[in-house]
């Protein structure tokens, strides 16, 4: 498997600019509400909700916002959201997977298709791009929690398959069926986690023409900015950008 580098298969996230803050909170709130609606409202008893709350805290979402999102799941009325996945190919034929959470699949499909078309890419059918990826459990830990030297041994002892250290965080990879067992083992040492999620990791990363890097980044960021989009994955490698 290719290394899960910063740009290869990264789940492109927003948050670099303050103006993105409200969008991040909106997406996190939606995920918290849906997770609470589908399961127990106690994060300790609901793995999906626990992961959503964990991500919200890592993004510095106020506690009141988190509690309101959970309470919203109990409302008698409200939109019914569904998870939908779109696959396609962007500039230079990079493979892309877009995960959405929507209350209007026609609107979402139209928006995603338009973004792909404007980039010179195309939206494909289910399975058209995902065969370039594998789903793995991804656990991210702030580097303040543990050193580079200690995290590798801990990851192996906890049942993980891979461990990578980046500038600000450690990333532990495992089989998706084992993610909560691995995390439970990590919790014997680690207190604060950035996120615990199932992600699409590329089997191989694809190098692209340096002249097209900016347009590819713009394409991926435009996908991210759609209100219905939760996660964007690609198999592109953009070097040091």
Model-predicted segments: where are they?
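N-terminal cationic and glycine-rich segments that engage phosphates or anionic surfaces
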Residues: 1-124, 129-138, 178
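Positively charged, low-complexity, intrinsically disordered RNA-binding extensions
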Residues: 138-241
């Amino acid at each position: 498997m290719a290394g899960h580098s910063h740009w290869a298969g990264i789940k492109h996230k927003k948050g670099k600019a303050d103006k993105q803050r409200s969008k991040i909170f909106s997406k996190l709130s939606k995920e918290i509400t849906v997770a609470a609606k589908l399961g127990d409202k106690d994060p300790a008893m609901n793995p999906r909700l626990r992961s959503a709350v964990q991500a919200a805290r890592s993004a510095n979402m106020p506690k009141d916002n988190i509690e309101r999102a959970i309470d919203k799941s109990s409302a008698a009325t409200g939109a019914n959201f569904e998870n939908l996945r779109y696959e396609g190919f962007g500039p230079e034929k990079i493979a892309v997977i877009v995960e959405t959470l929507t209350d209007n699949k026609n609107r979402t499909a139209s928006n995603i298709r338009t973004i792909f078309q404007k980039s010179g890419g195309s939206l494909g059918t289910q399975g058209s791009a995902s065969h370039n990826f594998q789903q793995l459990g991804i656990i991210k830990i702030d580097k303040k929690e543990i050193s580079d030297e200690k995290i590798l041994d801990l990851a192996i002892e906890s049942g993980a398959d891979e461990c990578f250290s980046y500038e600000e965080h450690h990333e532990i990879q495992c089989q998706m069926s084992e993610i909560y067992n691995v995390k439970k083992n990590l919790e014997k040492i680690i207190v604060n986690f950035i996120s615990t999620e199932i992600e699409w990791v590329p089997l191989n990363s694809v190098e692209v023409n340096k002249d097209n890097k900016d347009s590819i980044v713009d394409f991926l960021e435009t996908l991210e900015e759609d209100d219905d989009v939760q996660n964007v994955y690609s198999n592109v490698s953009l070097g040091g950008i």
